[in-house]
């Protein structure tokens, strides 16, 4: 049954949001998926969360591809992307790989979207690594990280718990139940199957590195340092990064706050049409290339 649900999705993935590999220094590569005009120097750039991958943005990309160039990466250590060199990489390491990739892809300006853990990478790019690239920033259900000194005890528990679960269950075991926390109770089985498929493609090493990123980063460091318009959106049924927490982040960062109806944490998978509609509205605010 799950194969029947996934087959049309996988076909769409190949035809509508194909993968391309970007070569980086030290024989590294980063896998990207792309829709829209590949010659544009402006793109909507989509960063996935800790238990996901580039393909999770498929339906959002299909909605946006006729309006803008759309790019989504498998972060280092995910899919066929090379893991980062440090065993415990920082958000700056991911942001550097992101900036290098976008340079190779010819992107000079972007609307940057970070979902969950992707928000920490996006924030680092926008604050210090390449702020000139980012015209607008969207955090969807942002992970705040556990890098603040006051969160040291919580950091240790999160690291131990996530790495123990990986060791005990493996990627397949994590994927088998991941949808139970990432989508709302009303999510159809096709959505759940797609969430599980994306998680099942994780590399153990890449996931372990991402746990270190989560534990070592602090989204609050971006306070007062984001020189572009910022949005924070969250699914109304999100139990991972609940609406109250996301609203607090929006207030701290001076961002516009909005909720996504009938969605849990994985709102780009559960409600892709609404997510794409909101992103398209931002594109209409003069963020597209000048064609005159």
Residue ranges, per PLM feature:
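Alpha/beta-hydrolase fold catalytic core
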Residues: 1-44, 65-68, 107-108, 280-292
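Conserved HGGG/HGGXW glycine-rich cap/lid loop of the alpha/beta-hydrolase fold
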Residues: 28-83
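Flexible "cap/lid" loop of the alpha/beta hydrolase fold
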Residues: 123-128, 132-167
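Conserved alpha/beta-hydrolase catalytic His-Asp/Glu region
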Residues: 150-156, 167-224
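Conserved loop-alpha-helix segment in the C-terminal half of the alpha/beta-hydrolase fold
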Residues: 227-263, 269
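Catalytic active-site module of serine/aspartate enzymes centered on a nucleophile-bearing elbow/loop
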Residues: 254-292
